[in-house]
Regions:
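Second-shell loop/turn segments in exported
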Residues: 64-66, 114-115, 150-159
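Solvent-exposed, acidic/flexible segments
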Residues: 70-72, 110, 141, 154-165
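Classical Sec-dependent N-terminal signal peptides that target proteins to the secretory pathway
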Residues: 1-20
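Basic/polar, cationic surfaces and motifs that engage anionic cell-wall
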Residues: 19-53, 154-237
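Structural preference for beta-strand elements that scaffold enzyme active sites
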Residues: 76, 145-147, 181
Length: 237
């Protein structure tokens, strides 16, 4: 009788373990499926032309020592806010191949600033520079960083933007195992933070611009949310 009870207990335990594993597996697959299905609008996607690519080669040669246009195994996601009122302004800025009206960084090269993603105030995510290519957005890190621009002003971004940032970060982390750090633009030149070990700048005269975007409160919320999601600590810098 004892043997029968013991066998029954073992059988039930195994079934419960299998059931729990199945549920966990389904949840994991479901989450991965949602990540793959993230809606990204390609309306403002820019396919770099020869002029932009040549200017980008000049920029990367000057600052990183190699004329490279491709973003391989990105290690950082940089969160920005545009410090502008609407999407149209930003799209018109990024569509130019040449840098215009930026006397603060014109010494660094002629290629225009850019971003990989733009998130509007309603939370809609737009692709801009294709992920295959480097974009000019953060001094010292463009060679290894993905840029996410949020329409609006530091620490005054919308709840819809916050939610879309979380979704996009999860999507990118799932896409690239190489990603180690997520930083706010205002943190880029803080050499006390772990991401700074990736800093690369050959031009010692290139002046670091002071940034406040996207705001400390916004970044703190992102990090708290990602911690709950279960990402590793090094993502929080």
């Amino acid at each position: 009788m004892k043997n029968i009870v013991l066998c029954l207990f073992i059988s039930i335990s195994i079934d419960l373990i299998a059931f729990n594993n199945e549920i966990s597996g389904n949840r994991s697959n479901s989450e991965k499926s949602k990540l793959k299905e993230l809606e990204i609008n390609n309306k403002y996607k820019i396919e770099p032309n020869d002029l932009r690519l040549n200017l980008l080669r000049e920029y990367t040669k000057k600052h990183y020592g190699e004329a490279c246009i491709y973003l391989n195994n990105p290690q950082i996601i940089v969160i920005h806010s545009t410090e502008t009122e609407n999407l149209e302004i930003v799209v018109n800025i990024f569509k130019n191949d040449l840098l215009i009206g930026r006397t603060d960084i014109e010494f660094g090269g002629e290629v225009n600033v850019g971003t990989h993603f733009i998130i509007d105030t309603n939370g809609e995510i737009y692709s801009n520079t294709p992920l295959d290519y480097i974009a000019r957005h953060t001094i010292g890190f463009n060679y290894t960083a993905i840029s996410v621009e949020n329409i609006g002003f530091a620490d005054n971004l919308t709840e819809e933007q916050f939610n879309s940032n979380i979704k996009l970060i999860k999507y990118l982390k799932n896409k690239y195992n190489s990603i180690k750090y997520i930083i706010g633009h205002y943190e880029y030149n803080n050499n006390s933070l772990p991401h700074f070990n990736l800093y690369k700048e050959l031009d010692i005269n290139y002046i670091h611009t002071i940034k406040i975007d996207p705001g400390t409160n916004f970044m703190n919320r992102i990090r708290n949310k990602l911690y709950n999601y279960g990402n590793s600590d090094n993502l929080f810098n």
